[in-house]
Amino acid sequence: MVLCFPLLLLLLVLWGQVCPLHAIPKHLTKARWFEIQHIRPSPLQCNRAMNGINNYTQHCKPQNTFLHDSFQNVAAVCDLLSITCKNGYHNCHQSLKPVNMTDCRLTSGSYPQCRYSTAAQYKLFIIACEPPQKSDPPYNLVPVHLDSIL
């Protein structure tokens, strides 16, 4: 039994080193992290665009999509009819019109030398929305997760 505690502690420490890959940086709200990861008003080459995201997480994110629109326009999608998200929650909303976007996929490298392919797209998107936190823009709901691309 005495041997179990150190082993459990080691597992928790190791899990903590893996878990932050999907965690939101502590000083950011979910909406701000969504904006950093997914909003780019104009197209940008993926190697450069992903560098900023990967610097927050200290790893190469395998895939990411940038919506080429304003945060305000994307947040307006949160006011549309709610639909079911991939995780079964009912806080997702689908865009009415397609938007230009860039899909970035990791092709090689390890942090900080991550290399990505860049693919331009014009598609609909589904986002998860939640009430804003204190430092978020004063909308009824704000985007917090890019659930899917259609």
Swiss-Prot record:
The record marks 61 as: Critical for catalytic activity. Disulfide bonds join 46-104, 60-114, 78-129, 85-92. Keywords: Antibiotic, Antimicrobial, Disulfide bond, Endonuclease, Glycoprotein, Hydrolase, Lysosome, Nuclease, Secreted, Signal. GO terms for biological process: antibacterial humoral response; antimicrobial humoral immune response mediated by antimicrobial peptide; defense response to Gram-negative bacterium; defense response to Gram-positive bacterium; innate immune response. GO terms for cellular component: extracellular space; lysosome. It is an enzyme of class 3 (hydrolase). The active site is at 38 (proton acceptor), 145 (proton donor). It comes from the Eukaryota. Residues 1-23 form the signal peptide. InterPro entries: RNaseA, RNaseA-like_dom_sf, RNaseA_AS, RNaseA_domain. Substrate binds at residues 61-65, 86, 105. Coiled coil: none annotated. It holds the Pfam family RnaseA. SMART domains: RNAse_Pc. The record marks 59 as: Facilitates cleavage of polynucleotide substrates. Its EC number is 3.1.27.-. GO terms for molecular function: endonuclease activity; nucleic acid binding; RNA nuclease activity. Glycans are attached at residues 55, 100. It is found in: Secreted; Lysosome; Cytoplasmic granule. Ribonuclease which shows a preference for the pyrimidines uridine and cytosine. Has potent antibacterial activity against a range of Gram-positive and Gram-negative bacteria, including P.aeruginosa, A.baumanii, M.luteus, S.aureus, E.faecalis, E.faecium, S.saprophyticus and E.coli. Causes loss of bacterial membrane integrity, and also promotes agglutination of Gram-negative bacteria. Probably contributes to urinary tract sterility. Bactericidal activity is independent of RNase activity. Interacts (via N-terminus) with bacterial lipopolysaccharide (LPS). Belongs to the pancreatic ribonuclease family. This is Ribonuclease K6. It comes from Saimiri sciureus.
